[in-house]
Amino acid sequence: DARHMGVEMNFTYRPVKWFELEGMLSVGDWVWDSNAKGYFYNQNGEPLKDLRGTVASGILADDHAWAVLNQKGVKVGGSAQTTGSIGINIRPLDGFRFGLDWVASGRNYSDYQVSSSNYSANSTINVADPWRIPWGNQFDFSASYSFKIAGVRATLNGNINNLFNHYYVMDAYNNITTAGEWDNVYRVFYSFGRTYSVRLKVNF
């Protein structure tokens, strides 16, 4: 089991009709709260006595091979535990809006992947501390214009995500028994570069 605790704050401030400031901050503390125990089976679903393929006398019998992941207290990986954003929306003309948001994430930890080389029957695998991924951030730009087409209201939206084409690490994996560092992680996933989207919405 994993324990997920944290606090989150959102705010919106509109001093005048045409200007809006908004933001959010989320701070979490996610750790594995218990160890995990599993049992070995072959591809036919039969319980194994050992890793050489010997079939045990029964499921969860005394000779059914097992392994324990000693992971209690280790940080949960795969998702940033601190996220925040701050942005502005400006409406200079009737129906027109544009906005700019700064989005940041931190305290993101690498995930681990268990392979057959980590296992031995009836033993405990000590899960090492994951790599703390450097924080990342990007700017997102958006604009919209509302108007009428033959008496029908329509809105044209455009977005440029990651406006400055900034790359940062979003996810990574490290060996389950080796303390995670930048030079021993693998399967590193980076953020998307600059992307664009345009959408037309018509309300009938």
Predicted segments — roles?
Residues 3-5, 80-84, 135-139, 152, ...:
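Residues that define the transmembrane beta-barrel architecture of outer-membrane proteins
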Residues 12, 77, 89, 130-132, ...:
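Residues embedded in well-ordered secondary-structure elements
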Residues 13, 17, 87, 141, ...:
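Conserved beta-strand->loop/alpha-helix structural units within folded catalytic cores of enzymes
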Residues 6-8, 69-74, 126-131, 183-188:
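Extracellular loop and loop/strand-boundary signature of outer-membrane beta-barrel proteins
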Residues 43-58, 119-127, 176-186:
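Surface-exposed loop/turn segments flanking beta-strands in extracellular/periplasmic regions
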Residues 95, 103-119, 145-204:
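C-terminal beta-signal and adjacent terminal beta-strands/loops
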Residues 1-114, 201-203:
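Gram-negative outer-membrane beta-barrel transporters
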